[in-house]
């Protein structure tokens, strides 16, 4: 039997992740480090595992992900997006429940740019009537 491998690209904010999924026992590696070591906060680890738990595939696959750009929250979202796409490549019937949960859709929200004359994207100097 050939070594089956499923691929998915995930993006979130300014992060991009390449996810390779092979049949295994649930080991998740991000940039060559174990998931628990790479994402220090529990929320990041939970976000990464969400797509697998949605389709009860938590211990069926080994996952290797390389992610770059952005911060920890964006990287976790990018890995989740990549895992969801890889699961859809593995079995087309999983696409519907993953889409209903919102894991297939690319979250298009980005940081709003700072405008000149303002402190931040929308924060202006304090206004005084008199």
Curated annotation (Swiss-Prot):
GO molecular function: RNA binding; structural constituent of ribosome
GO cellular component: cytosolic small ribosomal subunit
PROSITE patterns with a match to the protein in the record: RIBOSOMAL_S9
Keyword annotations from UniProtKB, A to Z: Ribonucleoprotein, Ribosomal protein
One matching Pfam family: Ribosomal_S9
Top-level division of the source organism's lineage: Bacteria
A single BP term in Gene Ontology: translation
NCBIfam families registered for this protein in UniProt: PRK00132.1
UniProt record similarity statement: Belongs to the universal ribosomal protein uS9 family.
Protein name per the record: Small ribosomal subunit protein uS9
Species name: Halorhodospira halophila (strain DSM 244 / SL1) (Ectothiorhodospira halophila (strain DSM 244 / SL1))
């Amino acid at each position: 039997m050939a070594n089956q491998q499923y691929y998915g690209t995930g993006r979130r904010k300014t992060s991009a992740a390449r996810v390779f999924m092979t049949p295994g026992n649930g080991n998740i590696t991000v940039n060559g480090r174990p998931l628990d070591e790479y994402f220090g906060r529990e929320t990041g680890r939970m976000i990464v595992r969400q797509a697998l738990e949605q389709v009860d595939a938590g211990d069926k696959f080994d996952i290797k992900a390389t992610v770059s750009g952005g911060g920890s929250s964006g990287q976790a979202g990018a890995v989740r997006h990549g895992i969801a796409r890889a699961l859809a490549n593995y079995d087309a019937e999983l696409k519907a429940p993953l889409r209903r949960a919102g894991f297939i859709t690319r979250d298009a929200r980005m940081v709003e740019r700072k405008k000149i004359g303002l402190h931040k994207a929308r924060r202006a100097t304090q206004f005084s009537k008199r």
